[in-house]
């Protein structure tokens, strides 16, 4: 009888030992990931999109960023901001200026040209309730900001500004002069039957602006880039 009792006690101890080992669980610090940064920026009302245009540095292309605004009355090009060429010819500079460029950019003495820019970043941040601030940054070429005036969604009562950001579909283009829309920033529309402001539709906009969402949005902006091949 005593032997049986001892075996049961040993078995119980082994079971508790197993449970105890399984309960050694921990939460550990971890490195902040890109999705965490994106989520934090979103919580602050900031959206960031980056585009790689390094294909347009194989040859020299003039780069310009444009901003269009559209509503029921039509479309207007508000701004076209030129950044210059994607490649810089050092041989066309005075020798003193050339040496300064080489020193600043850590270029070898034999360098005759260099790539000025390879990517474009668009930053949408909140200036106030009715104004968004668009910042365009092309490292090595230019940086500027433009205000985007928002419009009331028409829901009645206090003004409500409900806008959403969608990228355009991007496809390969032929070498030459190209105008490429990058981002569609659009107002929602008020649905009186449901009593809500909607902004339903595709996740990527067709460059031809044929999506139903485009027709339903009462006000939107298009941000794009123009490449013109230099002979």
Predicted features, each with a name:
Residues 1-26:
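Bacterial Sec-dependent N-terminal signal peptides
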Residues 23-39:
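Short N-terminal segments immediately surrounding and downstream of signal-peptide cleavage
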Residues 49, 63-65, 223:
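Hydrophobic residues positioned within well-ordered beta-strands of beta-sheet architectures
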Residues 53-55:
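Short amphipathic, basic-aromatic surface patches that mediate peripheral association
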